[in-house]
């Protein structure tokens, strides 16, 4: 469920140099919305750095989705009757780091709270799903085993996307999944343990691009408010 989209975002007009608890994602690649924003209807997809963290935001433009970046690693997403979006904060490149995170995640319908990243050579989109809404993405993927880590069992899956949007345009690529059996919205994720488990299951990664603690939604509504750190 990935789509990088032109996001439909409603932003209230702001005047003056007011300090804001959140920065709205604007159209500049650096993502630092420190200047006054004017009212706008459409914000383009973007990635860059904000308060020392890498961020990525993509939407297919359907429905309403609003992404706001707070202090440090904090971000917030609100969405209603959306198409497909995925966004969050983390690092570039991805590594086997241990990721600490917490916050709230309240999907009404289909949505994921996950560690999300990409590699090249091979081109792979990967997910470590910590919580999800009404749809378990493993239900239509190939089960490749399990791994016990960070206090629970994760089921491993692989699926293939044919001629779909990716970090390198429209491509065919594999998706790797680790799906936690008991959902949670805070904790630690040892990514090296997942990478090792995938490799043992024949699911090989390439050279890492970004790695974020992401919120993703598809044809749903909801909200999330998340912070992320590394140990």
Curated annotation (Swiss-Prot):
Q: Which keywords does UniProt give here?
A: Carbohydrate metabolism, Glycoprotein, Glycosidase, Hydrolase, Polysaccharide degradation, Secreted, Signal, Virulence, Xylan degradation
Query: How, per the record, is this protein's activity regulated?
Result: Inhibited by the proteinaceous endoxylanase inhibitor I from T.aestivum (TAXI-I).
Domain GH11 span(s) in chain numbering: 41-229
Judging by the UniProt lineage, the source's domain of life is Eukaryota
| PROSITE patterns per the UniProt record, alphabetical | GH11_1, GH11_2, GH11_3
Residues spanning the signal sequence? 1-19
Residues annotated as coiled-coil are: none
The glycosylation sites annotated in the UniProt record are: 32
* Alphabetical list of InterPro entries matching this protein: ConA-like_dom_sf, GH11/12, GH11_AS_1, GH11_AS_2, GH11_dom, Glyco_hydro_11
Give the Gene Ontology MF terms in alphabetical order.
Answer: endo-1,4-beta-xylanase activity
Which BP terms from GO are recorded? Answer: xylan catabolic process
Compartments where found: Secreted
What this protein catalyses is: Endohydrolysis of (1->4)-beta-D-xylosidic linkages in xylans
Report the active site residues. 125 (nucleophile), 216 (proton donor)
Q: Which GO terms describe its cellular component?
A: extracellular region
What EC number is given for this enzyme?
Answer: 3.2.1.8
Thermal dependence of catalysis: Optimum temperature is 40 degrees Celsius.
Supply the induction statement: Expression is highly induced by xylan.
Q: What top-tier enzyme class does this entry carry?
A: hydrolase
User: Annotated pathway, please?
Assistant: Glycan degradation; xylan degradation
Q: How does activity depend on pH?
A: Optimum pH is 8.0.
State the Gene3D superfamilies in the record.
Answer: 2.60.120.180
Instruction: Give the function comment from the record.
Output: Endo-1,4-beta-xylanase involved in the hydrolysis of xylan, a major structural heterogeneous polysaccharide found in plant biomass representing the second most abundant polysaccharide in the biosphere, after cellulose. Plays an important role in causing fusarium head blight (FHB) on cereal crops.
Q: Which family does it belong to?
A: Belongs to the glycosyl hydrolase 11 (cellulase G) family.
Name of the featured protein:
Endo-1,4-beta-xylanase A
